[in-house]
Amino acid sequence: MSSNSGDVRLWGGRFADGPAEALAKLSASVHFDWRLAPYDIAGSRAHARVLHAAGLLTEDELTRMIAGLDRLEADVADGSFTGTIADEDVHTALERGLLERLGPDLGGKLRAGRSRNDQVATLFRMYLRDHARTVGSLIADLQDALVGLAEAHPDVAMPGRTHLQHAQPVLFAHHVLAHAQALGRDAERLRQWDARTAVSPYGSGALAGSSLGLDPEAVARDLGFEHGSVGNSIDGTASRDFVAEFAFITAMIGVNVSRIAEEIIIWNTKEFSFVTLHDAFSTGSSIMPQKKNPDIAELARGKSGRLIGNLTGLMATLKALPLAYNRDLQEDKEPVFDSIDQLEVLLPAFTGMMATLTVHRERMEELAPAGFSLATDIAEWLVKQGVPFRVAHEVAGECVKVAEADGKELDELTDEQFAKISEHLTPEVRTVLNVPGALASRDGRGGTAPSAVAVQLAEVKADVAAQHAWADAKK
């Protein structure tokens, strides 16, 4: 069924000879654009209907055309029909398949009023919109895992860091919800991108539109484009900003996941011992029997570079292309296909790693006040006593200097040492030199107080539920 029955190129009438073998190999894209076949067939059904509405197909011809497309779709799905290098691309392969099933007299009528230029621009949008929902669902799953960690450890304190140095104590739940919120913005970008992409280029033809009286709005409705057809046929066939934007979103997802990954790698070291990875989501060493390696996190970190590279390569391809369609745009698909493939493998594994993480409360809380991380609390306590912050900052810094010289933490300084540093440092300063007090005091919106984190948790859960609903809407 997949053998090539003659020359079914979609062009060639003005050429005396066929393309050179080297050109055919260079031009071939069916090995990577075959994944668009179901969308191409859906587009062909919609196109057949508007041909019928325009009087270019009879009722009987439409019925037989749809039946032939249905048979072709089934054969593609079960693998009995595939493209070959001689087909050049998915569009040519499927036209060959239709001609084999319907013959040239009927099968050949489907080409009227459309070009590969508007076909591929439409099919690519359909494909990416479907996978945007798949990726969006996987992001929501990862957010669910982070929410689960926050709910399981609502009162665990840990050292918050800036520049990877101890800064201020924070709740572990506060920390993981920060990652959940970043991923939520990625999910929001997908939803916003989908709304912008819900416009059909079908009917644009090669660039100038169609003279056959076809209805592009009917095709748009048939194919699920909520915002109808494009307003400019040249823009419809030539623009790939929707591809570049999608590639950026996937790269941003990779970057955000890589930030979590880097922390897991650090936290999993013996020196930190904040977390332990589940055996099912770790690997060993071929020579060192004691090793338990965070390969998922490391692969996430590495794949983020790959996703960024796909975006960069795509942008370089699109740069300075004149209107309208150019063959350079054949190169727009593989980078984005790869980004989708990578995320759809990476995100489930990463979610599994996070969902099965063991958190070591004692170790986190041991280090939460370390590194003089309560110094800011001293300064803010002084401000509440009426001391200007500039002075309070200097006094708190002096406390750190004295404690560091004595090999102590701030809460280990004596009342006499505090009094010697500043007359404002009365024994009451000790009320803020503890982690629970430091956490509870930061109760403004977005803060690390348990009450503030509870609000964040509820908001993230609501956002994740909305994301799941959007992702599942077209399944």
UniProtKB/Swiss-Prot annotation:
It is found in: Cytoplasm. Keywords: Amino-acid biosynthesis, Arginine biosynthesis, Cytoplasm, Lyase. It catalyses: 2-(N(omega)-L-arginino)succinate = fumarate + L-arginine. SUPFAM superfamilies: L-aspartase-like. NCBIfam families: argH. Gene3D superfamilies: Fumarase/aspartase (C-terminal domain), Fumarase/aspartase (Central domain), Fumarase/aspartase (N-terminal domain). Coiled coil: none annotated. Its main location: cytoplasm. Pathway: Amino-acid biosynthesis; L-arginine biosynthesis; L-arginine from L-ornithine and carbamoyl phosphate: step 3/3. Pfam families: ASL_C2, Lyase_1. Transmembrane segments: none annotated. GO terms for molecular function: argininosuccinate lyase activity. The lineage of its organism: Bacteria, Bacillati, Actinomycetota, Actinomycetes, Kitasatosporales. Belongs to the lyase 1 family. Argininosuccinate lyase subfamily. GO terms for biological process: arginine biosynthetic process via ornithine; L-arginine biosynthetic process. It is an enzyme of class 4 (lyase). It comes from Streptomyces coelicolor (strain ATCC BAA-471 / A3(2) / M145). CDD domains: Argininosuccinate_lyase. Its EC number is 4.3.2.1. This is Argininosuccinate lyase.
